[in-house]
Amino acid sequence: MNIKPANRVNSVQEYYFSVKLKEIAQMNSRGENVINLGIGSPDMPPAPEVITALSENAALPSSHGYQPYVGIVELREAFASWYRRWYGVELDPSNEILPLIGSKEGVMHISLAFLNEGDGVLIPNPGYPTYSSVAKLAGAQIYTYSLDENHGWWPDFQGIEEAYAKGEIDLDRTKLMWCNYPNMPTGANGSLELFEELVAFGRKYDIVICHDNPYSFILNEKPLSILQVDGAKDICIELNSLSKSSNMPGWRIGMV
């Protein structure tokens, strides 16, 4: 038999964190006592009220059928209320929120929705490995932009435009720009000033700004959303998740 996978599979390798977790497990088995600074997995359980609510609803016969394709109304309304409470952002649960099986699913959906083969995507370096692996599956042209400590680990928009002027980056064919603040892996925080710059950059070059926002409660007494910026909804998509904020990574609950 000669069964071959699709060519696109050749462009990706085993997930970076999967490889590293195996290495860590091997080192720990040798007694090296490695501290894992990789995946941001909370080591505390969800609130007792959340577990109680899950248990009660799991007993209801109505909880086990197919859901609507856009998620149940109550969940979308709860997400809208959550954004209003914590971010001061108004979202229409009927057409501005889509529940996800964790926000990683959203990285794939967004990439396949916007990227044709050969289209450009701006990805931070260092950055979340999934951005690159999904872009490769989509056949996109990856343009990395460096996050430098001397620049506060923020995008250097002037540097990106200089690379464009030199022909090193084709912003005319670039469809998406990935960013996430608070940033993984640098730990740098964001600000409304940064988000305003991102929105302005996206508007200038017709690039969809994709803000991955699972860590907003980690460094901020008042969590930030890029959607707080005027006009952000016209050019921005934000991913969010209950994994870090509510200690629920195994529940796979996210939103876009």
Question: Where are these predicted regions, by residue range?
Answer:
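N-terminal small-domain helix-loop-helix segment of the aminotransferase-like
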Residues: 2-6, 10-102, 109
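Helix C-cap/helix->beta junction micro-motif
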Residues: 30, 138, 204-205
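Short acidic capping loops at alpha-helix termini that bridge into adjacent secondary structure
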Residues: 90-97, 117-120, 173, 233-236
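Conserved PLP-anchoring active-site segment centered on the Schiff-base-forming lysine
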Residues: 113-135
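A short helix-loop-beta submotif of the ANL/AMP-binding
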Residues: 137-143
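Active-site phosphate-binding strand-loop segment of PLP-dependent enzymes
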Residues: 147-221
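Active-site PLP attachment segment
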Residues: 229-256
